[in-house]
Amino acid sequence: VCVAAVACAVGAYRFVYLPLRPADVSHARISINATGKFDESQIDGAVKADLAKLKSWNGCRVDAVRYDAKRSATLLAAERDVTASGGSSSISTAIDEYGMDNVIYLSNDISCRAGSQNSSQDGWGSWYAWNPGSARAEHGWIFIDEGY
């Protein structure tokens, strides 16, 4: 009876509790490679907003959040160029609305456990726009989109 109770408890923990709890962001490694576009407090705010957003990845762990100013600028320019011929995306709309100098890209590494399976999302991107006066802003940043 004790073995069955322990097995049930372990199963409930692994298959019910873990998948439903908010993502663990407490051990995320933060890496910043900035060039002056945003000040330290703005970048810190973007990271905090991103970690708060990533908590919705129930049952996962955020391993790393990275900001690289050059990579962010390259991806923004590429997005602008791809949509310049008449296309549109959430990122290009944010560039039009907030200005290219107010949009940031963060890269995230996330590990998830689904039952007995582990998976990882390395390089998962998050896009934010700096608009501290907005009621929608968290730490001064408005979430725009996420993905690869």
Residue ranges and their predicted role:
Residues V1-A5:
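Hydrophobic H-region at the start of alpha-helical membrane spans
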Residues C8-S120:
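Flexible low-complexity loop/turn motifs enriched in small/helix-breaking residues
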Residues Q121-Y148:
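Short beta-strand edge/turn micro-motifs at domain boundaries
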